[in-house]
Amino acid sequence: MRKISRILLLFFLLSTSIFGNEPLITKEKAPLSVALPLLKSIDQYAIIIGSGPTHMYAFIDPVCPRSREFVSMIVESAKMQERYTYHFFYYELTRFHTKNMIGTIYNATRPLEMMKTIMVDEKEVSVMTTFSSDITKEINAISDVAEKLDIYKRPYLFVVKPQKGGQ
């Protein structure tokens, strides 16, 4: 009986180590041929940092620790800003309940500065609870595209390299 229980335990441990390494979420990213027209349709709402030839579209949440690390890394690196043009879109991770904060960022006179204050400096700001129809339209347009692209984590990135031959 002891031998059988040891064999079962060994089998259990082996199976959990093999199957435990499988990713929990196995989603395919939308191909760029599908994603790029959708991203271009909301580009007017992007907060842009950098001036490089390679464009990086990023969906971020203002409270998400990974998004904050990513934005801080870019803001603090002139080299990254020379290599890439970053197009940031705020898209709420529902567990953080940041829709009002996102609206506050987009409603700011200088959204880039507000973004840095919240995400890089990690300062508290007064969060608005009502927004103009234009801000609501921006947030909804970004959410619609994010849902079509099945964005499920933050930051979620699309990289568009410059075409060879200057085209």
Q: What label would you give each PLM region?
A:
Residues 76-79, 105-109:
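Short, low-complexity, polar/charged sequence segments that are solvent-exposed and flexible
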Residues 96-107:
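Short Fe-S-cluster ligation motifs
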Residues 16-97, 128-162:
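Extracytoplasmic thiol/disulfide redox context detector
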Residues 2-10:
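Sec-dependent signal peptide recognition
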Residues 10-16:
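Sec-dependent N-terminal signal peptides of Gram-positive bacterial secreted proteins and lipoproteins
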Residues 106-134:
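Short, internal strand/loop/helix patches
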